[in-house]
UniProtKB/Swiss-Prot annotation:
It comes from Syntrophotalea carbinolica (strain DSM 2380 / NBRC 103641 / GraBd1) (Pelobacter carbinolicus). The keyword Transcription applies. Disulfide bonds: none annotated. This is Transcriptional regulator MraZ. Transmembrane segments: none annotated.
Amino acid sequence: MRFKGEFFNAIDAKGRASIPAKFRETLSSVYGDERLIVTQSDGGLAAYPYQEWHKMLERVEALPSNDLKEAINLAIISPAVECSFDKQGRIQLPKAQRCYAGLESEIREIVVVGAIDKIMIWNRTKHIERREQAEAFLRAQSQELKNLGF
């Protein structure tokens, strides 16, 4: 079982985000570890299970030293933080990450999305816009979708 589903929620005044119980159960049962590594990703936040994060680091380390590797290190790896759950199933999102993802305004609505091997945390408005763009793209790819069985 991997991460799937979409959950609408909010960040509290202290910057804590509740992660759905279904996702916490997957962390325990599939990964045996509830720690998450949270980093910036394409205007939102990506929360990786500890093991998935380390697999990704190994792939990055294997890259030759070049502009791509440097960009990955600066934009994705450097801002990453380890997060653990409190007793209410929340993680503390650092202010810099909340600002990056547009989660620092008076409206603190978020969407927590399962994305197979990671959990994405989006500003609700941004998530809806991205999903509409994805749906339009998929309509243009109808034959490819049929080939995949969708």
